[in-house]
Amino acid sequence: MAVELGLGVFSGEWHPGTGLDHSETLRESIAQVVHAERAGLHSVWVSEHHFHPANFVGSVAPYAAAMVQATERIVVGLGLALAPLHDPIRMAEDAAFLDVLSGGRFQLGLGIGYRDVEYEGFGGTRKQRVRRTVELIEICRQAWGEGTVEYDGRIYQRHGIDVTPKPVQPGGPPIMMGGHHPDAIDRCARLGDRFCMDAGTDSESYEGGDGRNRGLLERVESAVRIYREALARHGRDTGAPHFSLNVGGFLHPDGRDAAWAALAEAYMMTRRVYGDWYGLAPEEYADWYPDRMTPEQIEQRKGELLLGTPDDLFPVLSQVRDLVGENLVIMFRSKYPLVDDALTRQSIDLLGELRTRLRA
């Protein structure tokens, strides 16, 4: 597989400032997925979150099914579903159904999550999140194979269950696992098919660092090295690791400043949401609004994103391609609430041009 460029993440969130109701917003997002397919993008990705005033859609399987039904070629993936919140048999059935409906175009991305309110809302706790994820994957693998599920875990016990229909893809849809800690990378090397790195998260910046992300290329190189080492420990192929990079940004024909102008309000709203989720005190993100930020603060925020034209973005993404190799999927987050539909579609078209250049 050559390097690929996909579009993410679709969370289905709704904001009244758009002038649309939530139904119209969801239909608009499905139309953008169709537009992404026409632009030649490889994939679209749906993420899962619950219980927040930003109106995130937690029902990721139906959302993905709507995208599958509206398209013919593009890969539709969960990037990422929160594994500890799901019953493993239900997840196995939903993933198999999506794979059958799509004709084998579905990929299952899984994360362990980090928000206590989400675990508690589904009757779980943070301390069980890793074990629940491991057992869910093991049960799904059994369920997608021949015969019945026979599983005795610390959390789940399932016996005599024959999940049907079986997936189209032999062995089931590929499982992508996210995270940024070496333990998460090792877990993916042992259980998954592809590792997903979030370009917006740098574990070293929180562990004795200064709170700022290291350079993107440095972090990609480090993650690929750690992933290869983990694959080797588990006796798996290390030659061309299956690696995804989730990176935020926006494209505009007039360059970086125009891209930021289109995205600034929406991006800073997203940063405030994540500031809350990461446990910051409200006063710490009270001034995270473009009109309250200094020029220096704005430049710092721009540096968290890939902004500009295809010519602007090609150099750094081609270096990422060269670091990772041929099994790279770049999950480019260019879908944000509050951004005008026409500007989003324009960014998608430019992503299509960028994909062509990266694959040349």
Model-inferred region functions:
Residues 1-360:
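Active-site-adjacent structural elements that line small-molecule/cofactor binding pockets in enzymes
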